[in-house]
A protein has these predicted regions:
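Functional transmembrane core segments of multi-pass inner-membrane proteins
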Residues: 42-43, 149-190, 194-195, 211-212
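Cytosolic, membrane-interface loops and tails of multi-pass inner-membrane proteins
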Residues: 69-87, 187-212
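Multi-pass membrane catalytic core of lipid/isoprenoid biosynthesis enzymes
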Residues: 79-120, 209-233
Length: 245
């Protein structure tokens, strides 16, 4: 019985790892860490580590809730039909409960280890992605990724305001870079899985406007993203120059 319980726990953790979308979470951690390294702060490494962990936990919770809301659509798409919920490897109720627990404790934890502003922004980000984007935007407009991309762009801002109240324009530029990067990144996958999205009746940009126009828009967003990266570099350079004088 102990061996069976152990195997069940291991299997649950494996399925949980898939549910939290580790590729997405690693990006959240990386961008939040970049903001923390730039932010002027005298917070301890422990506080910074807890803040980063709680942001990752909140992102994990919203990813799980996203998969719970999308479980029916996922079962219709070749790319997603083997995910834990549609494949039956984890129950929908278990996934929902886990997502809610992760989301709740991340927001509450950030209130104690960060501040109320960061906690509220994290709660907004979770709701924006898991409810507004997943339940509404994704199914209503070809601009779903553009508008919904705000959720994925906010972690640097959350991380920054958790430990610092100075020079807020830096994390806003980081947010802008990720926001502009999201459409070309997501549309590349949408082009590759164009038929999959069409079969699931999801109005991705390539499905609604064709591949040629999508490629044109990808180039526009890429150009704007590069410009925003250069603006961050210029700000950092001028800031360093001012400090040296």
């Amino acid at each position: 019985e102990q061996n069976l319980f152990f195997l069940q726990v291991v299997n649950f953790l494996k399925q949980l790892y898939v549910l939290i979308k580790p590729g997405v979470i690693s990006l959240v951690i990386f961008t939040a860490l970049c903001a923390m390294l730039l932010a002027p702060s005298d917070k301890s490494l422990f506080i910074k580590g807890m803040t980063l962990t709680l942001i990752a936990m909140g992102a994990s919770g919203s990813a799980i809730l996203n998969m719970w809301f999308d479980r029916i659509i996922d079962s219709k798409m070749d790319r997603t039909k083997f995910r834990p919920i549609p494949s039956g490897n984890i129950s929908a109720n278990t996934a929902l409960g886990t997502g809610l627990i992760f989301s709740f404790f991340s927001v509450v934890g950030l209130f104690f280890f960060g501040n109320i502003k960061a906690s509220i922004l994290l709660a907004f980000t979770i709701l924006y992605y898991s409810v507004f984007y997943t339940m509404y935007l994704k199914h209503k407009t070809a601009q779903n990724i553009v508008i919904g991309g705000l959720a994925g762009a906010l972690p640097p801002v959350i991380a920054w305001i958790s430990i610092s109240s100075e020079q807020i324009f830096y994390p806003l530029i980081l947010c802008l870079i990720i926001f502009l990067w999201t459409p070309p990144h997501s549309w590349a996958l949408a082009i590759f899985r164009n038929q999959d999205y069409s079969d699931a009746d999801i109005p991705m940009y390539p499905v609604k406007h064709g591949i040629k126009k999508t490629l044109f828009m990808m180039n526009i967003y890429t150009f704007l993203m590069v410009a925003s990266v250069n603006s961050l570099y210029c700000l950092l350079y001028t800031s360093d120059a001012a400090d040296d004088t």
